[in-house]
Amino acid sequence: MNILDKIDAASLRDDVPAFRAGDTLDVHVKVIEGTTTRTQLFKGVVIRRQGGGIRETFTVRKVSFGIGVERTFPVHSPNIEKIEVVRRGDVRRAKLYYLRELRGKAARIKEKR
């Protein structure tokens, strides 16, 4: 194990739940506004999870006031307070880019039993 691997291993988080594409998450993000810090909730469906180790990221999509919003987070970011899995989705793909074109009820994902 070289020096960079040791540094990466030291900054990995251990409180990340197991989730994959299709799951609905609550991501609690720290937002700094001037001198105050608050927590902002971003709730949506995971459309992709990519990378590995310290560089691993995931993208969450939600529809806010009729407009699709996607946000990409590093899994091991210190700006994420916690990640909660709300629902497990039953999908057959690792990347759910096709959800971008679907509207309304067609964009729903079945819940895993």
From Swiss-Prot:
Key words of the record: Ribonucleoprotein, Ribosomal protein
Residue spans crossing the bilayer: none
One of the record's GO molecular function terms: structural constituent of ribosome
SUPFAM superfamilies documented for this protein: Translation proteins SH3-like domain
InterPro entries reported in the protein's UniProt record: Ribosomal_bL19, Ribosomal_bL19_CS, Ribosomal_bL19_sf, Translation_prot_SH3-like_sf
Domain of life per record: Bacteria
UniProt keyword Ribosomal protein present: yes
GO (cellular component) term, any one: cytosolic large ribosomal subunit
Xref: Gene3D superfamilies: 2.30.30.790
Any one GO BP annotation for this protein: translation
Function: This protein is located at the 30S-50S ribosomal subunit interface and may play a role in the structure and function of the aminoacyl-tRNA binding site.
Family to which this protein belongs: Belongs to the bacterial ribosomal protein bL19 family.
Alphabetical list of HAMAP family matching this protein: Ribosomal_bL19 (MF_00402)
Protein name as annotated: Large ribosomal subunit protein bL19
Source organism of the structure: Corynebacterium glutamicum (strain R)
Gene name linked to the record: rplS
